[in-house]
Amino acid sequence: VQECVSEFISFITSEASERCHQEKRKTINGEDILFAMSTLGFDSYVEPLKLYLQKFREAMKGEKGIGGTVTTGDGLGEDLAEEPFTSQIPAGLITTDGQQQNVMVYTTSYQQISGVQQIQFS
């Protein structure tokens, strides 16, 4: 299962990275991931994820605290109330467009956002 998940993430990330490259950007954002999912045939997940992303950004908006920033798709930084990253997982090397990059994956848990249902993958 882990191999399949890794391949899926690489598949989506590669498509999102290609879009960023075409638009001469270096950072993949949520909209790039959603675009990639739609392009690759995962349309049924795009709308619920758009809603979740919107609700997540609304929940993060206005929280203030440690001085860290979150960059949203509109390019605006937002202050965070708490340290958002609770652990780091070294992800090794991911190949995108023929180049290898060192990547650090940050994980955390957030409260359930009201009005958003969890997505069940099957």
UniProtKB/Swiss-Prot annotation:
PROSITE patterns: NFYB_HAP3. Residues 1-12 are annotated as: Subunit association domain (SAD). Gene3D superfamilies: Histone, subunit A. This is Nuclear transcription factor Y subunit beta. Its main location: nucleus. Can be divided into 3 domains: the weakly conserved A domain, the highly conserved B domain thought to be involved in subunit interaction and DNA binding, and the Glu-rich C domain. The keyword Nucleus applies.
